[in-house]
């Protein structure tokens, strides 16, 4: 099993690769993720059912169990959310401000990927997918 430092290093290395992906590749990957979620719906619901049972058996409070539970509508929203992210403008490389200095040097302020986005959360399978989609679109790796 990998330790947390090793996982973080792998995320950082992946961040380099994601930061140079072109918009078309990112959008194709997002649509492929949405399709794979749809194609694996039954398996995802089966695993989620096991997670919910384990949560209840371990005394997790009902509010967290509810957040953990995938419903048909939550699943549809999750898949459609990935497709929606694919339709958004690519934030990478967007120029927000710029000017030419007296010496002729052009100075611009533009958006670039962070590299790795770390997120701490619990009991929300849809958040996993949302974060992954947003990080992919913005050229970042994620560490969940």
List the model feature ranges, each with a label.
Residues 1-105, 134:
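N-terminal Rossmann-like NAD(P)+-binding subdomain of aldehyde/semialdehyde dehydrogenases
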Residues 87, 91-144:
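Conserved small-residue-rich beta-alpha loop and adjacent elements
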């Amino acid at each position: 099993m990998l330790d947390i430092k090793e996982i973080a290093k792998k995320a950082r290395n992946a961040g380099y690769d994601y930061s140079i992906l072109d918009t078309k590749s990112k959008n194709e990957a997002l649509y492929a993720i949405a399709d794979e979620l749809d194609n694996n719906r039954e398996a995802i619901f089966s695993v989620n059912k096991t997670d919910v049972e384990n949560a209840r058996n371990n005394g997790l409070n009902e509010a967290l169990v509810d957040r953990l539970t995938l419903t048909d509508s939550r699943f549809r929203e999750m898949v459609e959310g990935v497709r929606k992210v694919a339709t958004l403008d690519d934030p990478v490389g967007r120029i927000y401000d710029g000017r030419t200095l007296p010496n002729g040097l052009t100075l611009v302020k533009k958006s670039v990927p962070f590299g790795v986005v770390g997120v701490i959360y619990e009991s929300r399978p849809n958040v996993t997918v949302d974060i992954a989609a947003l990080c992919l679109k913005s050229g970042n790796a994620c560490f969940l």
